[in-house]
């Protein structure tokens, strides 16, 4: 939510950014670059949102709050890492490579060939062992259709990606063992639960546009030292006021204009412009009741989450060679070899 109606006669208007996750960090850096005085307000004692690490009390080992990855097509995130000077603390595959196993231990490999997009996918699809030849032909036909479909058509927001796939001849096996293999880690849900527009976006931008779009990247050290801590140092060095431990309790609105935010401590923080990078529920709860009922904001309360269960296991010996792998026909979706990943 941005109040766009306030101007300042003395230089750029001051901006309060609500939320210190990745979106809030990026917004604060961008606006500070434009010369705006910035105050960044974050509920927790650190920046990074859900991209953080903590020390396990029993082992003393630094543990990430779940495994976070990005793709080569996430150009804005890559730019952010470079701007913070921490890109070298992350790893990005030189080419897309994904090992896929089933319950029986049969392994398949999806990898980008040294061919121009989208033909770089062809060898991997033709040799992928987890779907039959009939499915492979139908998958290739659907990928061609996906590449040339305008994902911004309104009706594609009204149907699920699963429905779009079924309309284009995809079987349950192909959806579970190939399409969802990409959709679940990208959109944090299955094809049945995401719009056709979003599903098409993932395949168009992540797989079909360029040969390196699907290259997988991840932090090579703990998440907090890889982004949250350097982000705070960067922002403070740039003159941004970083207010940690300040949960936003209420957003004050007068005559359809935001005039301040009240922190849980009771302090009122004011600026001339306001940007919300809060989670949907957090934003909705902070709004005055009359504003909560407005059509634009009422939908925030109806948004549902799709939680991820992360299990951290310590072994007394190496148990896998790959940095990570994916699974089909299993409630287990991905396994990451943290000993290999953490440099």
Predicted regions and their residues:
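Glycine-rich active-site loop/strand segments that organize a redox cofactor
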Residues: 49-72, 140, 145-148
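Mobile amphipathic helical/loop "lid" adjacent to a hydrophobic cofactor/ligand pocket
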Residues: 77-78, 82-201
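Conserved Rossmann-like nucleotide-cofactor binding loop
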Residues: 23, 46, 281
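Glycine-rich FAD pyrophosphate-binding loop
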Residues: 32-57
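N-terminal Rossmann-like FAD-binding beta1-loop-alpha1 element of flavoenzymes
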Residues: 13-40
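Short loop/edge segments at beta-strand edges and connector loops
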Residues: 19, 94, 244-246
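Mid-domain catalytic core of redox enzymes
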Residues: 2, 11, 96, 246-343
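Helical element adjacent to the flavin cofactor pocket in flavoenzyme catalytic cores
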Residues: 201-265, 269
